């Protein structure tokens, strides 16, 4: 099964739980893609003492998950040049289907 997760929030708990779900699905053998849009493109900067989001993101990508982000949203939120975004594919306004 293919699973798509859209993250439109910059609430640390919400984003952390979305990536936890993504990690679970990847471990179950599902093909999973996360699409960051709107405030969701801020995900890498939302770590707190309780919610280690970048750790969840790293596990997700290392497990085979894919992360894409709205390029326009990255620009609006001034996040286009971050070196930490090595694992985020830039997309237009909508994600494309993952190759088979």
Model segments located where?
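Short coil/turn connectors at secondary-structure junctions
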Residues: 1-3, 28-32, 64-65
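Conserved active-site and cofactor/substrate-binding residues in soluble primary-metabolism enzymes
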Residues: 13-17, 52-55
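Histidine-anchored nucleotide/phosphate-binding helix
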Residues: 15-27
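Short internal beta-strands
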Residues: 22, 32-37, 67-73
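Small/aliphatic-rich secondary-structure junction motif
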Residues: 26-33, 37-44
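Mid-chain, well-packed structural core segment of small domains
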Residues: 49, 53-92
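Low-complexity intrinsically disordered segments
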Residues: 96-98
């Amino acid at each position: 099964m293919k699973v798509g997760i859209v993250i439109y929030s910059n609430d640390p708990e919400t984003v952390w739980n979305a990536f936890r779900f993504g990690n679970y699905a990847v471990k179950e053998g599902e093909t999973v893609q996360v699409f960051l849009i709107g405030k969701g493109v801020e995900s890498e900067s939302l770590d707190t003492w309780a919610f280690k989001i970048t750790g969840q993101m790293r596990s997700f990508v290392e497990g085979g998950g894919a992360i894409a982000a709205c390029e326009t949203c990255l620009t609006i939120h001034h996040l286009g040049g971050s070196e930490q975004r090595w694992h985020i594919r830039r997309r237009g306004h909508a994600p494309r289907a993952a190759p088979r």
